């Protein structure tokens, strides 16, 4: 009960003293009620306080007047800011209170502050205009840009705004600017996307390492935040090569077809993209096969281009572009830790690359080899040097992070007498005839190693050593050589000589002193030596790159186009909407230009001919005939691949495995003439199976089994054909590029004598049909009558898949192939033989097959290929034992005694790589 009066007394205010001034009471009311609740302007309070700076107000706040009521004073401190409803009012009140304490002598008016802020904003916008530019696809770290702004404010003696305010100022200048969060997990940072630093800006070199001597220059900036994971090639998946020089901008010498050049450059870019994709996937051994298939499988009509000096130089430029992208992909410029297995694979790849290129260029013009090999050697040397440096950096990094090791190295290096070593170095060059004043002296050597000691004392990282070496080489080699016009190579040799000698003498002293850190210092010295060699080689390679650039400028009509082609950076397939109409993901080669096909019913009252682009089908089955559009058509044929067989060239040795037709001389076999014979196919290469749902083009058609779709999707695109073992005649007219003309017969696989053909009772003009099965081959055109014989061609007879390399008339060559392209990201693997998948028990082995007397059980031995019959006969059903003339299937396995021996090993000879010339022959032939 005694505590109650105490509590009451605690809240009882003391008797106000008559000495308290009215101004002090007003100030108390201001803090209690808030300035918004006063009935008089608040300036009156501050004017009174300004008139009496040492009066009661200032004393009350300092607690110098004991007469001030204690209760009111407590409430003043407890209610500070609680009664203010607006943040701006509170900030204004606090600022005015502080200004009053400073006697308001240096306080700026609000108007003056607004003027200064507006002026600073204008200066900032002008600074942004001078140093930055809109650049699509470029990311700039937000922290770097703000650091540049702080440097600008320091130089201009301005008060910098906060990061948020500066961000608003940037968007005033670049309204379309966006932000992205980039970086590894745990170390990601915000970046401005769509803005870049101008080359004329002072900040350009510091960010983009323009003054850096190697790819690793500026890695201190790139490595900000460190790395927690090892480098993986999978992070580069989707990398696309930049654009190669366009044939439209080239200045040709002599009579050269622009279409052929364009085709060749397109072929070579796809070839280079395949090399890049396999390098990213780690399939380095597959790259050798791509090289062989491209160069040894070059079409004959493009071979003369390889002797043209302009084309050879363009190849060199393209090689330089490929090698730069390969280097960026294989070796990270951020000096990220790499797995040992990846380093070993890259070393092995660099070791074998030159030999792979040389072997692939056999039997080709020597001028091409002489120009390509020097570029190859520079690439290999650079790859080896960068791999070695990166490996040493990974080993040296833990040593530099170990404080005990660093202290030991500093202690041991302090015992080395650098002056005595400098004197020895001076003696070694005393007999030199070089009298230039800027020669690298012993003083420079001592200075350099003194800087090295300072870096060790500061616990410098690998990136700091790189930055220091860049400065050393720049100041003592490159800059001096430019000033006096001395050869860079000569200057670099002198520097390396003295650097190596001085380093060897330092290691000699450490050995004599029994330094405990000898191993660690030896590792650091190896790292520094390797980087200096890399910096020198990079400078020499840059000079060679400039020569290629000048060469390209000479051949290009537009110099800007040549510079853009040579300096373009690789992109990513994830940045572009590629393959919008792509088919199944397993497709390796996709048709991209399918012809929209019209279908007309065929009736008995329609005896006329059909246009070449129309496909007849029975009128009675129109309700069940599915009409497919472009997408369905591509899906139905998407599983077919281009046969991976290079043409058999008469002038070349068998450098590569060219499949079953390798080694067939083109001179063997008669020159085909109309009417041409239909080829019979080895039974082991083209096995067939019964099929209940047989269509116009059966899914198990006679093409190589390794390229047959697995599993076989049923195709319902075309109606049934009524003729068993017969095929319709194809027209003699010249067809478009997507059509093939030819006469074929559904002859049995075993040999049978030709039989006479009686005229058909129904006459009808022939029509042509679209050739959809691009995976099939050995189809020959015919300009003769609509009849063909069932004779068997010898195994050595030429096949008509590849153009002019086979000796038959131009009229028998196939038309242009359907436009195709190889998938950019695809790993090519060897496909198992057909029997390993569908016949693991060898049930269908040739020796165990039952010999049949005839391939067509329901037809006579004389099977004719004649003109189509009328619609009434087209609607008849097809027995299960029928065959659709080269496209269809059969449930019987014929005896083929003449080709058993040849077909036994043909499956093993099939190569798994699609030849580049088969993909582009259509475009090349069309451009001739």
From Swiss-Prot:
- From its record, what is one biological process in GO terms? positive regulation of transcription by RNA polymerase II
Pfam families named among the record's database cross-references: BCD_RFX, RFX_DNA_binding
Taxonomic superkingdom: Eukaryota
UniProt GO cellular component terms: nucleus
Which spans of this chain does the record mark as coiled coil? none
Instruction: Give the UniProt subcellular location, in the record's own words.
Output: Nucleus
Residue stretches of biased makeup (Basic and acidic residues) = 92-101
| First-listed, main subcellular location of the protein, grouped into a coarse class | nucleus
Q: Which parts of the sequence are annotated with region: Disordered?
A: 1-22, 53-102
| Statement: the UniProt record of this protein carries the keyword Glycosyltransferase | no
Q: What does this protein do?
A: Transcription factor required to direct islet cell differentiation during endocrine pancreas development. Specifically required for the differentiation of 4 of the 5 islet cell types and for the production of insulin. Not required for pancreatic PP (polypeptide-producing) cells differentiation. Acts downstream of NEUROG3 and regulates the transcription factors involved in beta-cell maturation and function, thereby restricting the expression of the beta-cell differentiation and specification genes, and thus the beta-cell fate choice.
The entry describes its oligomerization and partners as: Interacts with RFX3.
Family indicated by similarity:
Belongs to the RFX family.
* Record protein name field: DNA-binding protein RFX6
Q: Which organism is it from?
A: Ailuropoda melanoleuca
**What does the organism's lineage look like at the top?**
Eukaryota, Metazoa, Chordata, Craniata, Vertebrata
Q: Which gene encodes it?
A: RFX6
């Amino acid at each position: 009960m005694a505590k109650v009066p105490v509590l009451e007394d605690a809240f009882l205010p003391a008797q106000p003293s008559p000495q308290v001034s009215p101004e002090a009471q007003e100030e108390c009311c201001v803090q209690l009620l808030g300035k918004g609740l006063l009935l008089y302007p608040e300036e009156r309070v501050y004017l009174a306080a300004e008139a009496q700076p040492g009066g009661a107000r200032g004393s009350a706040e300092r607690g110098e007047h004991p007469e001030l009521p204690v209760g009111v004073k407590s409430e003043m401190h407890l209610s500070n800011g609680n009664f203010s409803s607006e943040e701006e009012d509170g900030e204004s009140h606090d600022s005015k209170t502080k200004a009053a304490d400073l006697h308001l002598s240096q306080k700026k008016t609000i108007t003056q502050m607004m003027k200064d802020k507006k002026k600073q904003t204008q200066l900032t916008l002008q600074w942004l205009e001078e140093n930055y530019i809109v650049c699509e696809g470029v990311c700039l770290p937000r922290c770097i840009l703000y650091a540049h702004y702080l440097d600008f404010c320091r130089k201009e003696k301005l008060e910098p705004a906060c990061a948020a305010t500066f961000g608003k100022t940037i968007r005033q200048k670049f309204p379309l600017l966006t932000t992205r969060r980039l970086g590894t997990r745990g170390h990601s940072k915000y970046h401005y996307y769509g803005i870049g630093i101008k080359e004329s800006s002072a900040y350009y070199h510091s960010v983009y390492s323009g003054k850096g001597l190697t790819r690793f220059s500026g890695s201190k900036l790139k490595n900000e935040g460190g790395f927690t994971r090892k480098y993986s090639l999978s992070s580069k998946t989707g990398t696309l090569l930049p654009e190669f020089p366009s044939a439209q901008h080239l200045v040709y010498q002599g009579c050269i077809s622009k279409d052929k050049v364009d085709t060749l450059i397109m072929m070579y870019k796809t070839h280079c993209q395949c090399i890049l994709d396999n390098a990213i996937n780690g399939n380095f051994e597959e790259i050798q096969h791509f090289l062989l298939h491209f160069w040894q499988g070059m079409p004959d009509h493009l071979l003369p281009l390889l002797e043209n000096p302009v084309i050879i130089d363009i190849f060199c430029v393209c090689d330089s572009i490929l090698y730069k992208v390969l280097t960026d992909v294989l070796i990270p410029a951020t000096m990220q830790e790499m797995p040992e297995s990846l380093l070993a694979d890259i070393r092995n790849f660099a070791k074998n690359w030159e030999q792979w290129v040389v072997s692939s260029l056999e039997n080709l013009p020597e001028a091409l080899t002489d120009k390509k090999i020097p570029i190859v050697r520079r690439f290999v040397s650079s790859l080896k040097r960068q791999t070695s440096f990166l490996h040493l950096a990974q080993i040296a990094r833990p040593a530099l992070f170990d404080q005990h090791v660093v202290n030991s190295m500093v202690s041991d290096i302090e015992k080395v007498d650098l002056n005595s070593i400098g004197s020895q170095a001076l003696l070694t060059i005393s007999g030199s005839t070089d009298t230039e004043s800027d020669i690298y002296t012993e003083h420079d050597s001592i200075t350099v190693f003194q800087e090295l000691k300072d870096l060790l004392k500061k616990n410098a990282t690998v990136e700091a050593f790189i930055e220091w070496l860049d400065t050393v080489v720049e100041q003592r080699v490159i800059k001096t050589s430019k000033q006096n016009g001395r050869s860079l190579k000569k200057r670099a040799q002198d520097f390396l000589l003295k650097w190596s000698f001085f380093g060897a003498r330092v290691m000699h002293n450490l050995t004599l002193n029994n330094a405990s850190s000898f191993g660690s210092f030896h590792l650091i010295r190896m790292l520094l030596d390797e980087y200096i060699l890399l910096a020198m080689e990079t400078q020499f390679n840059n000079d060679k790159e400039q020569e290629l650039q000048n060469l390209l400028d000479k051949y290009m009509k537009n110099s800007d186009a040549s510079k853009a082609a040579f300096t373009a950076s690789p992109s990513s397939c994830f940045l572009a909407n590629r393959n919008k109409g792509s088919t199944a993901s397993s497709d390796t080669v996709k048709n991209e230009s399918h012809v929209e096909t019209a279908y007309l019913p065929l009736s008995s009252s329609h005896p006329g001919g059909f246009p070449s682009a129309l496909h007849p089908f029975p009128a009675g089955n129109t309700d069940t005939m599915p009409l497919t559009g472009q997408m369905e058509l591509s899906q139905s044929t998407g599983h077919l691949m281009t046969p991976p067989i290079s043409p058999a060239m008469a002038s070349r040795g068998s450098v590569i495995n060219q499949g079953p037709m390798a080694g067939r001389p083109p001179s063997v076999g008669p020159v085909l003439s109309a009417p041409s014979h239909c080829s019979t196919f080895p039974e082991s290469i083209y096995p067939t199976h019964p099929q209940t749902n047989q269509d116009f083009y059966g899914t198990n058609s006679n093409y190589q089994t390794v390229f047959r779709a697995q599993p076989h999707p049923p195709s319902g695109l075309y109606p049934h054909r009524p003729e068993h073992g017969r095929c319709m005649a194809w027209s003699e007219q010249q067809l478009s590029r997507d059509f093939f003309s030819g006469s074929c017969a559904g002859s049995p696989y075993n040999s049978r004598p030709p039989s006479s053909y009686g005229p058909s009772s129904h006459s009808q003009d022939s029509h042509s049909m679209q050739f959809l099965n691009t995976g099939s081959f050995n189809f020959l055109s015919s300009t003769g009558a609509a009849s063909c014989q069932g004779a068997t061609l010898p195994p050595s007879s030429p096949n008509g898949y590849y153009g002019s390399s086979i000796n038959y008339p131009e009229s028998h060559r196939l038309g242009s192939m359907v436009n195709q392209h190889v998938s950019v990201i695809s790993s090519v693997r060897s496909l198992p033989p057909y029997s390993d998948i569908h016949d693991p028990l060898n049930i269908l082995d040739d020796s165990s097959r039952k010999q049949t007397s005839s391939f067509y059980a329901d037809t006579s031995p004389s099977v004719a290929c004649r003109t189509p019959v009328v619609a009434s006969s087209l609607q008849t059903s097809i027995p299960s034992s029928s065959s659709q003339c080269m496209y269809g299937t059969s449930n019987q396995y014929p005896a083929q005694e003449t080709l058993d021996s040849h077909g036994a090993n043909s499956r093993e000879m099939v190569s798994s790589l699609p030849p580049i010339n088969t993909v582009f022959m259509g475009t090349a032939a069309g451009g001739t």
